Structures are given as structure tokens and as C-alpha cells.
Amino acid sequence: LPEKRINVGKKHLQTLRNLETRCHDSFQAFVVIDARSSSTRTNVFLAKTRSCPNRGRSIDPDSIRLIREGKRFTGLRVVLEEWLDTYAGKDWESRPVDARLLFQYVPQMHEGAKKPMQLLEEDTVAILDSQLNEKQKVQVKALGIPAMLCSTAGVRDFHEWYRDALFVLLRHLINNPSPAHGYKFFTNPFWTRPITGAEEGLFAFITLNHLSRRLGEDPARCMIDEYGVKQCRNDLAGVVEVGGASAQIVFPLQEGTVLPSSVRAVNLQRERLLPERYPSADVVSVSFMQLGMASSAGLFLKELCSNDEFLQGGICSNPCLFKGFQQSCSAGEVEVRPDGSASVNEDVRKNRLKPLATYCSVNNPEISFKVTNEMQCRENSIDPTKPLAERMKIENCSIIKGTGNFDKCVSQVESILVAPKLPLPANIEAASSGFESVDQVFRFASSTAPMIVTGGGMLAAINTLKDHRLLRSDFSGDVEELAEAAREFCSSEVIIRTDGPVIQLPNARGEQKLNSLNFDLCKTMALTVSLLRHMAAGENQPSFIKWEKSIAGPDGKPLADLGWQVGVILHHVLFTEEWGRNAYEAGYSHNL
């Protein structure tokens, strides 16, 4: 009997000793705040962590899951513009402003940032409370929640010191959350900052290849060469991501590719985007401002309707709009009414030319001190010396009418957006990487890698044609098939029904309700056709092209949407030692 009790005691002691030396798994939440061009939105992720004695804690990258997207709140550009309206005075975009004097109003900028950040915090807490079980809540609160707030093209071209100052304030607000809910949010200057266009594209590239399981440490991808050196091939796919204010093109290069000396490729390991243990890859990553859905719409109207070929007697004939559709001559946001008329929002901030017109100001040092930047603005019919209202105005134009001529639409999209004579304004970053326009990307560099196109507008264009059986359900990027389908769709006429306006397709292919989301869909189709033609004209062509919103897991459920959000998490957590120092050694306790 004593021997039995002795063995029980030994076993109990051994169990406790094993607990001291074995690894422990727990869950950690991540908050990625997408400060995009139109709004700011929280994305809450959950991942499994493993803590091992003497090795620290690391994240299992395959466990990262989006648990919910948050609500849309005020964009950072609005926060900055409202602060400038108040302290620089109305119409600051049209006159000289002494930026140095505005430093005295930094406390007021801090106050202005508090409200949107409070709303984001409350929204995030509501998601965590509703989506986590009790055990997960305990673990998430104990580990703290890394927060990564990144701005993309929405404030990328915002001049002076205002943007960077705002980010100092945002980091302070994140690091000082309300104590009431018990969640400990924390961040640092590496995680919360404006990201460049190239970074946005590279993070989207990492997201795509991680979720589709092309990116990893798979031994099957590696071999030992004749010199005893480990060589790993990559099976990576490229991505074309089109947002609201910019478009990113990223693809891997074949081994041995020779590029012009002016073109800069990015090595994922050398630039510390991925650790050395991952297969090495050189990629092209370029981002173009003014090629997002909203920004390109404003610039396209400004240029098209300033051209005498399309502007006659105050009427601009737009080949990218349906026959029977008309609107007032403005780049403001359009609402299609039930009676078929189009109401254009006259609010300056709702004008899709506003960001570009703000940039193209003689009061912006990027314009006043750099002649080439001023030339680019003037090439696009924007005179930097004029007041903001005039920079946004389309001269001598009162009405825009659709003509539904898709071939002419493609030619204008090509000449205005894809292959302009001069680089589109605010594209210093793209030019510095060796590309002044989209057509140059595939002329100077190309790849046989698969290409995935993502972005709401691009997906809507393809899915609309599939819905009307104008494209095959398995459409894989044949440019002439797409051009023929779009040509038929865009020749449709707007008809007013009792329940509202519809697009009446030719050849008895049915009807589709006309609304504020699809009235200018043909411009997006034309952009897609132009893009595919340039891909096909390159020295190498993609093995296939697909349009995707998200990547599904083995259970068929989406793992996460494509975009840069998962990529920015991976970029940080895969460097385990650095991540351990920032997230666990310092962590939220750094701010105590």
C-alpha cells in the first residue's frame, strides 16, 4: 500500500515536471486597421501561438484566421482635412499656408483623432466579445493584442508634416486603450504607419501566396545542388490589386531574368519581407496612384471631357457610359435615382478629383519645387496655380452623355490611364522603381507565373459578364473573349421601367438594374481589357489568370479576403526573434 502511494506521488511530480518543460499553446488576437482611401475599418484575426521553454513564443502562420471585419468609420484623410479646415482656414487647398505655424494646433489634432479611434476600439471590443469563447478571452487578454494600423493610398500623397504627425498621435491612442474592457491593445512605429504602394502590393502578394499554400518551407520545393548548397524553387503567383485610389501589380521573376538597369526588382529575403528559411524569390512590385476605381474615374472624366473630340457644345460624349445615361459634368459621386436621372454630389469631399486636385497645387512643395510634377498635373488638364474649385472643374462642359462605344472606351482608357505620355500625377514612387506607366511594366518585365486579379470593381466587371452568360464560368483571361463580351454588354441602352432604370442588353440577353455601382462598369471592363493585352504582349505570359475575392480552406470556407492585411501580419510574425521582442518582451507592458 505505501508503495502504491509512493508511485502516485512520483507520477504526480513527473506530471508537474513535464508541464514545466513542454510547450504550451494559446490563442492570440490581432487587430489590423485598414486606413483606406474612403474609410477606416478594423479586421480582427485570431492565431495560435506556441510557447516553449528557452525558445520563446511564436505564431503558427497557418492558423491565422479572420474572425470578422468591423464597421466602416471616418477615413484618415477626412480627419486631416477637417483639422486643416478649422486651423488653417477654409479653402486652405487654394492658398499658401505656413505649415510651421500649425504645429501649435497639434493638441487639437490629437483631440480630433480621439473620436474615430474610440469608435474603432469599441467596434473591435464588440467583435472580440461576440466571437471568442471564454477560454480564448482569458488567453487573448493575458497576451495583449498587437494592433497594426496602416494607411494606403488615401493619404499617401498628403503633403507637409501632417500625416506623419497624425500617426504619432494614433500610436499613442492605441497604446492607451480604455481599461474597462480588459483588452490590452498595443502598437509601435513598425506596425502603425503609412505604407508605401510597393509595400501594399508586396503584402498582398504574401497574403495570396500564403493562403493558397504556395508560400512555405515545404521540403518538396528544395534540393541540394552539386555544390552542396540548398536551393529552393518558388511556385509563387502574381497579383493585380485594384483599390479605391491606387492599383498594385506584383509578380515573381523567373530565375535568370535580365531586367533593364532602370528597373528595380525586390528580393523577398534581402528586403526582409520573408525570413531566409523561405524559398528565395525576386519580384517586381509597383503601385500606381490614380488607377484605383474612384481616383481613375475622376481623372478619366477630367481628361476625356477636356478633349475637343468628345466635348461639343458643352456636351461630353462618354464612350464608357451606356446609351441613354446622362449626368451633370462633374467628377462628384453619382447616385442613380428611381426615375433614371443621375444626381451628382456637389460636396467637395465627395468629388473623385479632390485628392488629385489637392496634390496638384502650387502650394504643395512637391509641385512648386519639382517641375516634372507640375508638368504631369498640367498634362492632365489641372493648373496648379488655380483655386481648388477650378482645378476640379471640367471647363466648358455641362452634361455628360453615354454613347456605349466600347472600342473607343478602351482606346481612351489606354491613352489616359494605362499608357499616358507623361506619368500620372503623384507617381514618384512608381517612377523610382523603373515604371512610369502600366504599359511599361509588362514591356520591361514579365512572368509565366499565374496572375490573380482582386478588388471589388474588377471582380464585379467579370462576374456581371458571367451572370449574363457573355463570359464562360471558367473564363481564364482570354482578352478577345473578354473584349467581345464587354462590347456586347456596353452597347446596352438604359430603359426606364416602372420599378426604376434598367440596362437592356442586346440580343434578348435580359436586363439588369442600373445603379450607382454599375453605371460606369464599362470603364472597368476597358481597363481590364487593356491590362490583359499588355500582359499578353510581354516576353512571357502568365500561365493562367483568375479573378478572386478570397481563398477558401480545405473546408470550403474563406480563410480571409485577398489584400494586404494577412501579409502585414506575416511580415512581422515570421521573424520570430524580432516578433518575440516586440510582442512579448516589450509587448503591452512597455506602455505601463
UniProtKB/Swiss-Prot annotation:
Catalytic activity: a ribonucleoside 5'-triphosphate + H2O = a ribonucleoside 5'-diphosphate + phosphate + H(+)
Catalytic activity, EC: 3.6.1.15
Gene assigned in the entry: NTP4
PROSITE patterns tied to this protein: GDA1_CD39_NTPASE (PS01238)
One term under GO cellular component: membrane
Similarity field: Belongs to the GDA1/CD39 NTPase family.
Protein name: Putative nucleoside-triphosphatase
Keyword set includes Ligase: no
Active-site annotation: 200
PANTHER family: ADENOSINE/GUANOSINE DIPHOSPHATASE (PTHR11782), GUANOSINE-DIPHOSPHATASE (PTHR11782:SF83)
InterPro entries: GDA1_CD39_NTPase (IPR000407), NTPase_alveloata (IPR017227)
Keywords, ordered alphabetically: Hydrolase
GO molecular function: nucleoside diphosphate phosphatase activity; ribonucleoside triphosphate phosphatase activity
BP GO annotations: nucleoside diphosphate catabolic process
